[in-house]
């Protein structure tokens, strides 16, 4: 069932250091090596909103996520292919990951219909009928030319009945087999996605059916879709602890600072989320002291930067008062600078975690970070995640 063939050498994953379940590694791709743990900014339409490729490189971005669903519908994958793929189309020269389009299609609710063949949905742009199947998803992703592509899966909503989740994960495995069968390019790594909701036995069933495909990496899917942290993190710990040690582990759609720290503790290597840019556009900045609301009254007269410890352009040049003024004046520079800062904050966060892991100091570092971030009220789910992180992986 292993159809990876020659790509295993191209996509080498080398662990550098371990500290409990947390680990640092190098993941080699055709467009260069990335170091993990890492956070991937989301460029839904082929751009990280408001941020240029040069700025992404300057703040430490290593791999960008692009969205198959949106790019398939507009401008169409063939136009992207005509540019030589996503790097030529976007002018970002580094590695890309494309999602399969499954999550966006599943989010359409009544506008889509799922069958064994795939998903039929209404194009949100013009109302036309569109069909997305495992074969079509791979075809589009090969045209987009990302380094890492995702298997087409069904992400059940939360809450969902257990029989539905089980039927869904069974279908996801069958779709994975079809993705494998039609994949043609050796310079793209196909990652499989483990589903099962918050049910450990269903997660185990998904793992047992998915692991034999021996893909170059594995994703933990179907989480951060509305369940509580208390439900989510036992599922993360259970799944990550049973994934291959020598393959990258990707927790999909997760990007809050506390989630990155807890996820890394449990052995996760890769994260993505729109959170840092979306929250920046709404006037919020991420810091080690929690989220700073620049819409509130206090920052309007504060002459310090967002974060004195941050080296992003906004923190090196602007005061909180100036950025708060720009927000009130509805100037586009404000959401741009806050998005830039928030992305740099998450990149700095994983950089600091890599340093701590390499120095065998991850748990003391995380204890200090969480005490400050949560202002002394560290939530139980976070503490429990770290308790699980000291247990041996199964």
Swiss-Prot record:
Active site: 99 (proton acceptor), 272 (nucleophile)
Pathways involved: tRNA modification; tRNA-queuosine biosynthesis
Region (RNA binding): 253-259, 277-281
Cofactor binding comment, as recorded: Binds 1 zinc ion per subunit.
One cellular-component annotation, GO: cytoplasm
Annotated residues for binding of Zn(2+): 310, 312, 315, 341
Chemical reaction(s) catalysed: 7-aminomethyl-7-carbaguanine + guanosine(34) in tRNA = 7-aminomethyl-7-carbaguanosine(34) in tRNA + guanine
Gene Ontology MF terms: metal ion binding; tRNA-guanosine(34) queuine transglycosylase activity
Keywords: Glycosyltransferase, Metal-binding, Queuosine biosynthesis, Transferase, tRNA processing, Zinc
PANTHER family membership: QUEUINE TRNA-RIBOSYLTRANSFERASE
Protein name (record): Queuine tRNA-ribosyltransferase
Gene name of the encoded protein: tgt
């Amino acid at each position: 069932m292993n159809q990876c063939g020659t790509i295993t050498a191209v996509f080498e994953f080398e662990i550098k250091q371990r500290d409990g379940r947390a680990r640092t590694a190098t993941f080699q791709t055709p467009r260069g090596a990335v170091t993990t743990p890492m956070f991937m900014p989301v460029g839904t339409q082929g751009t990280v909103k408001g941020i240029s490729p040069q700025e992404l490189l300057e703040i430490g971005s290593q791999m960008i996520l692009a969205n198959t669903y949106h790019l398939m519908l507009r401008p169409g994958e063939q136009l992207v292919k005509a540019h030589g793929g996503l790097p030529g189309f976007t002018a970002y020269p580094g590695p890309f990951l494309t999602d399969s389009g499954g999550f966006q299609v599943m989010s359409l609710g009544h506008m889509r219909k799922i069958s064994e063949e795939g998903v039929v949905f209404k194009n949100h742009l013009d109302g036309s009928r569109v069909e997305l199947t495992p074969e079509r998803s791979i075809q589009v992703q090969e045209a987009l030319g990302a380094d890492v592509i995702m298997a087409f899966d069904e992400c059940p909503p939360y809450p969902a009945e257990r029989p539905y989740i089980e039927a869904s994960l069974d279908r996801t495995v069958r779709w994975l087999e079809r993705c494998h069968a039609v994949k043609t390019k050796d310079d793209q790594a196909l990652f499989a996605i483990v589903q099962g909701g918050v049910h450990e036995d269903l997660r185990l069933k998904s793992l047992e059916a998915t692991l034999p495909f021996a893909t170059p990496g594995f994703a933990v899917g179907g989480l951060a879709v509305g369940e509580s942290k208390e439900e989510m993190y036992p599922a993360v710990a259970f799944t990550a602890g049973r994934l291959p040690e020598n393959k990258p582990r990707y927790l999909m759609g997760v990007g809050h600072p506390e989630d990155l720290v807890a996820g890394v503790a449990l052995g996760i290597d890769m994260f993505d989320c729109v959170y840092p840019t979306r929250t920046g556009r709404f006037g919020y900045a991420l810091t080690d002291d929690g989220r700073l609301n620049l819409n509130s009254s206090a920052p309007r007269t504060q002459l310090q930067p967002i974060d004195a410890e941050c080296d992003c352009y906004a923190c090196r040049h602007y005061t909180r008062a100036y950025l708060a003024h720009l927000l009130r004046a509805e100037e586009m520079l404000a959401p741009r600078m806050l998005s830039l800062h928030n992305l740099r904050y998450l990149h700095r966060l994983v950089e600091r975690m890599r340093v701590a892991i390499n120095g065998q100091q991850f748990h003391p570092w995380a204890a200090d970070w969480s005490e400050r971030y949560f202002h002394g009220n560290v939530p139980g789910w976070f503490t429990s995640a770290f308790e699980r992180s000291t247990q041996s992986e199964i």
